[in-house]
């Protein structure tokens, strides 16, 4: 496989690349991560099963879109490819700062700047993509409440149902989510889609994001996600609200929006995430 990777990097970069250093990195999921270098040029390589090529191609498309539309530093996609057994994506190597940062206010203002661009009239995306390893359907909808209820919550509940797990009556709960979001006025914003601390950082103090799951939706989804697993520093939220204030009712909607990543984790990992999903559903049923 590594000969294929070397060849595709060479074709993409227009010079002969042959790695002399291959260092495996810690991975938060089933993807295998590597730092590849010839002593001069460095690249970040993700490797997975051949069937994951579509996921890597989606990631490349999402990164290119964020590069075009946002102020964030986003890694360039060098190439994607596959052999008989494996698929891979090669990204620009970006060295994340290790020290604690005081530039979270810039991260917040950059996200607000992205969300303020309302260039799409409908909710969805031009292709389905992935959140982690899970397929994320993005059929276009005119109404946000229908999109989120069906393409996000309903989809995740259906995936659980296919595993023999029913946390709630799916049809009833999807109808409830539609009703709860019915009166919420939304202008579609381009979302990162998986905006939590593990998918962002700083490079020489400049805010950077990666591993996106982009679509056009309610900007509050990105904010709610950022508060779920490891909330960001207050400076981030203060700066975001200064540039693009959140509207009344966000705290209630946050519970709805956070259910989506919780359900996704329940589908991927099961365990205590199933309990957490059940508890979140019960809160929304009250």
Locate predicted features.
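ATP-binding pocket architecture of kinase catalytic cores
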Residues: 23-26, 30-142, 146
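Active-site Asp-x-Gly
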Residues: 137, 144-149, 158, 187-190, ...
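Protein kinase-like catalytic domain
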Residues: 67, 115-119, 244, 267, ...
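ATP/Mg2+ or Mg2+-diphosphate-binding catalytic cores
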Residues: 265-286
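An alpha-helical support segment within catalytic cores of ATP-dependent transferases
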Residues: 2-13, 119-190
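Short helix/strand-capping connector loops at secondary-structure junctions
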Residues: 256-265
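Conserved N-terminal boundary motif of the eukaryotic protein kinase catalytic domain
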Residues: 16-23
